[in-house]
Amino acid sequence: TWAALREAPSLARRACEEGLRWNAPSPVIARTTARPCVLGGVALEAGEKVVMDLAAANRDPRRWTEPDVYDLTRDATGHVAFGTGIHGCVGQMMARMEATCLLTALARRVTSITPAGEPVPFINNWLRGYESLPAHVEVA
């Protein structure tokens, strides 16, 4: 997929969106019910906590063809990596712009990126990320 992005840096936005769908930085979110309601056939009272698994929604085979495959050409519109609605991440547009600019610049300047060691994820109940992600970068 890196070769495809190098050939077509204009795919950077799709690469960003597919990456967010495939491996959301915040895989779960929690909300509190404002009033009694029924969710998925379960009756909930006001004030109850509900945890939504965004990562599962982003890999739902009813919505995504081959959901466990990262596909640079996929239209990932509709993923919920940043939540949705009035509670969506306020910084999501900035994050998208930064990631798209970074991928575009890298695609123009870097011929390959390969692992240079084991990634070290940080442990957090609500976020995904890495303390260390060793990589060998070959500049064009």
Labelled PLM ranges:
Residues 1-140:
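Cytochrome P450
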